[in-house]
């Protein structure tokens, strides 16, 4: 389980940015010792390869809640195909159990080095967000950067919470916009 293998250096990197690591966020959010990591069915019998997202379920004040949280310290929290599939699996499980799902977003969008597979995974996630709409409460917490294609997923949830001076949501960054427009406004 990834929670038990947390690297202290990764945590200190987040603290330097005035942010918590996803493991710390889980420990603060859930009732003590109630969180259980969840792996998609096809991962249970294989060596699980960590892909920058932790999924699971537990209780918050005794209420069952499902969860996914991005790890910015792993590849900038970017969405790879497996990363997206893991989030989709936890949302579908939350729908089966008729429980709310909380997602903590902290990443740089699609994992470009994976090419079209990463973007396809994001598209499948957006579709799953729409399937869950009106079925279960979907709550998004923007706990850092939420960039590029990844910004659409929280936009499809029921509630979005941001953190003053830490949260950023954008499709295209200021540097790219200024370059394309030939301006220096942003």
Give the ranges of each region predicted by the language model.
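Short glycine/serine/threonine/alanine-rich loop segments
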Residues: 19, 99, 159
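Short alpha-helical segments and helix-capping/turn motifs at coil-helix boundaries
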Residues: 51-53, 86-89, 146
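Short glycine-rich loop/turn motifs
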Residues: 51-55, 64, 99-100, 126, ...
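Conserved catalytic cores of soluble enzyme domains
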Residues: 105-186
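A structural preference for short, pocket-lining loop segments at secondary-structure junctions
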Residues: 57-71, 86-113
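Intrinsically disordered, low-complexity segments enriched in small/flexible residues
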Residues: 1-65, 69-76
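Generic secondary-structure signature for well-ordered alpha-helical cores
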Residues: 4, 16-19, 31-35, 96, ...
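Flexible beta-alpha connector loops of hexameric P-loop NTPases
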Residues: 75-82, 114-119
């Amino acid at each position: 389980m990834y929670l038990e293998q947390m690297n202290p250096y990764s945590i200190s990197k987040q603290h330097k940015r005035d942010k918590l690591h996803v493991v710390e966020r889980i420990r603060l959010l859930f009732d003590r010792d109630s969180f259980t990591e969840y792996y998609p069915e096809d991962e249970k019998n294989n060596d699980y390869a960590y892909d920058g997202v932790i999924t699971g379920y537990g209780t918050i004040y005794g209420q069952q809640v499902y969860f996914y949280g991005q790890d910015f310290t792993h590849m900038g929290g970017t969405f790879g195909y497996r990363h997206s599939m893991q989030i989709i699996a936890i949302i579908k499980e939350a729908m089966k159990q008729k429980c709310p799902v909380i997602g903590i977003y902290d990443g740089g969008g699609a994992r470009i080095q994976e090419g079209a597979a990463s973007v396809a995974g994001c598209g499948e996630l957006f579709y799953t967000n729409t399937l869950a709409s009106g079925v279960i409460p979907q709550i998004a917490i923007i706990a850092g950067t939420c960039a590029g294609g990844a910004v659409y997923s929280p936009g499809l949830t029921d509630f979005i919470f941001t953190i003053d001076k830490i949260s950023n949501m954008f499709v295209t960054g200021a540097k790219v916009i200024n370059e394309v427009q030939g301006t220096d406004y942003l």
